Amino acid sequence: MSTSFPEGWYEPDEELHRQEMVEELQEEVGEGHVLKGLNVRLVARYRGTDDALFALDDGRIAQVHLTWSDEMETDPRFPATSVFPRFEAWLSFWNSL
């Protein structure tokens, strides 16, 4: 995804970092979570936080606050996730904050 992000968001340069973030998300997502079983790709991180943007295969974007709990979450509300139909919808939401 080649795009410009709002201030504070950045696109990680290293493939290893992107893969590690995807693996962390997959480890945390438990049964009933909106992202369980979906393929995702890291597109951006928010500096100084545990927030990340993931692209889904169908074009949707998920903003996720990772827990870094070292285990699968049992509550499907975690990691906290908001899913948007496309990047522009997320951007509009973010800019309204």
Model regions: which residues?
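Negatively charged, low-complexity tracts enriched in Asp/Glu with abundant Ser/Thr
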Residues: 2-38
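Charged interaction scaffolds used for protein-protein
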Residues: 3, 7-12, 24, 53, ...
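Helix-rich interaction surfaces within compact, conserved domain-sized segments
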Residues: 61-97
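Intrinsically disordered, low-complexity regions enriched in small/polar residues
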Residues: 7, 11-12, 48, 56, ...
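Amphipathic, interaction-prone secondary-structure segments
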Residues: 28-60
